[in-house]
């Protein structure tokens, strides 16, 4: 069999990043509508209503209306096969979001045009910078009153340090929103309100000086558009493919996801410009997506996607080669060969068995506790993909049982939740406490809720005197033993049995680092 490169070349794997409430879940819905994956987009407002958004499928997400877990959706568009990784938009889930960004080749950044660049967007952009991920920008919510579009572009350039190349330009906003003008095509696309849940035929006016444009949008707005475009074309950047691929320049589209307008414009841009599946760095070499032999890495573990079965699914990004049903793969970390006959493809919680998958695709492996985040699978070669870190948590709570006899179930539940990256667990060496660490407060609620629904364990969390944690290592065995002996009250094991220093205050941590210069205190740890 010759390896069909055209299959790899038509893949586009991307994630959507945004500040909470910038409209990311709505955009996900509309993208799937264009990809024919769903026929009527389930509106995301009306959190108690029956039409839940397709990508928010865990019980707690349905109640709260926030995307907590990463879903994967695949759909055809133009001549490409697009893999969309939906990431948690809520500020409390940055670690899961971070790891998802290790599995994509490009990102769509969604900005609320009334608010501009917000804090979470800044953090996520820092993460994409680590791998110079190409970014496409969608200025959303044009059906509301927005900030001046030139101001928005300036803010993106100054705050996020990336050049902007406007591809479309808005005509009015809020109640006066009339559509967008496409700079490269010299065409105006006219907006009709109330068309959000299905794909409509859009009226197109050719040419900027076409009198038809004045009739369609009104003389004032038509003239304003011409004036603004003169400024834009003088002051902004032209699109350059090379700068985009390097993560230095972002093409900018305007629209309203709720009104289902402008979404197809950035999808056209994504399929035309975004990179095909890229090579990946492993510990021994770089693996190219065009290689024939299979390789992939696990970036997320999701528990209980099927409430009827107490199962876990490991999400794996295929880096090279082709997955075929029933193939034998090497699980590198444990050195064992496994036959994978039941890998899954996804449509957010709806699963189908994968017959085949290529570089760029995401497949799900059934996991009975043997697979961890960061694991590499190959067709025999011993290598490990790098760059999938664990972060030291910023918040800590002690978990306490309502029924002390359920200690065993509690520990099992917490270890499983920590393996899938929902939370980190620490067991102090000197007592039986169970301390959980997270990047945001909401994760603690998620853990208590999932312990109850999935493990039948009633638990509560309470404050604990821990300010921060660091993984510790030392090359000098004798000095490490002395460090462990003198600091036993501050040492714990994490879910993977790695030794961790838990500090009651930052001052305490700084003192420990000064006292023991041979001990390395790590803020992140490779999975």
Swiss-Prot record:
Subcellular location: Cytoplasm
CDD domains associated with the record: RF3, RF3_II, RF3_III
GO CC terms in record: cytosol
Keyword vocabulary terms for this entry: Cytoplasm, GTP-binding, Nucleotide-binding, Protein biosynthesis
Main localization (coarse): cytoplasm
Residues noted as binding GTP in the record, renumbered to the chain: 18-25, 86-90, 140-143
InterPro entries xrefs: EF-G-like_DII, EFG_III/V, G_TR_CS, P-loop_NTPase, PrfC, RF3_C, RF3_dom_3_sf, RF3_GTP-bd
Superkingdom per UniProt: Bacteria
Cited PANTHER family: PEPTIDE CHAIN RELEASE FACTOR RF3 (PTHR43556:SF2)
Function statement: Increases the formation of ribosomal termination complexes and stimulates activities of RF-1 and RF-2. It binds guanine nucleotides and has strong preference for UGA stop codons. It may interact directly with the ribosome. The stimulation of RF-1 and RF-2 is significantly reduced by GTP and GDP, but not by GMP.
Family: Belongs to the TRAFAC class translation factor GTPase superfamily. Classic translation factor GTPase family. PrfC subfamily.
This protein's name: Peptide chain release factor 3
Organism of provenance: Haemophilus influenzae (strain PittGG)
Gene of this entry: prfC
């Amino acid at each position: 069999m010759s390896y069909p490169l055209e299959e790899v070349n038509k893949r586009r794997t991307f994630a959507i990043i945004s500040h909470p409430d910038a409209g990311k879940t709505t955009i996900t819905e509309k993208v799937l509508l264009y990809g024919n994956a769903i026929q009527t987009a389930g509106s995301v407002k009306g959190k108690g209503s029956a039409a839940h958004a397709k990508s928010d499928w865990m019980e707690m997400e349905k109640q709260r209306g926030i995307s907590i877990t990463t879903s994967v959706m695949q759909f055809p568009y133009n001549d490409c096969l697009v893999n969309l990784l939906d990431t948690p938009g809520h500020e409390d889930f940055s670690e899961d979001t971070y790891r998802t960004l290790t599995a994509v080749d490009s990102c769509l950044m969604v900005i609320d045009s009334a608010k501009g660049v917000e804090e979470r967007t800044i953090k996520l952009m820092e993460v994409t910078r680590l791998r110079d991920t190409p970014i496409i920008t969608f200025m959303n919510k044009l059906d509301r009153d927005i900030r001046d579009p030139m101001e928005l572009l300036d803010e993106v350039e100054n705050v996020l340090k990336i050049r902007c190349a406007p591809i479309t330009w808005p005509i009015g906003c809020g109640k006066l929103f009339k559509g967008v003008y496409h700079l490269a095509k010299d065409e105006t696309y006219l907006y009709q309100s109330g068309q959000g849940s299905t794909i409509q035929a859009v009226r197109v006016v050719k040419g900027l000086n076409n009198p038809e444009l004045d009739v369609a949008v009104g003389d004032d707005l038509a003239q304003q558009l011409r004036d603004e475009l003169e400024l834009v074309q003088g002051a902004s950047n032209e699109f350059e493919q090379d700068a985009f691929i390097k993560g230095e320049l972002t093409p900018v589209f305007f629209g309203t996801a709720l009104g289902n307008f402008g979404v197809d414009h950035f999808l056209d841009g994504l399929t035309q410009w975004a990179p095909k599946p890229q090579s990946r760095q492993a510990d021994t070499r770089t693996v190219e997506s065009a290689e024939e032999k299979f390789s992939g890495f696990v970036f997320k573990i999701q528990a209980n996607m099927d409430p009827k079965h107490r199962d876990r699914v490991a999400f794996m990004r295929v880096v090279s080669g082709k997955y075929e049903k029933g193939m034998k793969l090497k699980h590198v970390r444990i050195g064992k060969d496994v036959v994978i006959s039941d890998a899954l493809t996804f449509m957010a919680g709806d699963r189908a068995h994968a017959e085949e998958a290529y570089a760029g695709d995401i497949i799900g492996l059934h996991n009975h506790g043997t697979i961890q985040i960061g694991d590499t699978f190959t067709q025999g070669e011993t290598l490990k993909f790098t760059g999938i870190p664990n972060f030291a948590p910023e918040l800590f709570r002690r978990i306490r049982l309502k029924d002390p006899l359920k200690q065993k179930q509690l520990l099992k539940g917490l270890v499983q939740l920590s393996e899938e990256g929902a939370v980190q667990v620490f067991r102090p060496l000197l007592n039986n406490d169970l301390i959980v660490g997270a990047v945001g407060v909401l994760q603690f609620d998620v853990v208590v809720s999932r312990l109850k629904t999935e493990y039948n364990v009633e638990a509560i969390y309470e404050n604990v005197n821990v300010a921060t944690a660091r993984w510790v290592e030392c090359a000098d065995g004798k000095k490490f033993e002395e460090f462990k002996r003198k600091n036993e009250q501050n040492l714990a094991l994490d879910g993977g049995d790695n030794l961790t220093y838990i500090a009651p205050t930052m001052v305490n941590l700084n003192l420990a680092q000064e006292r023991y210069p041979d001990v390395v205190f790590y803020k992140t740890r490779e999975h």
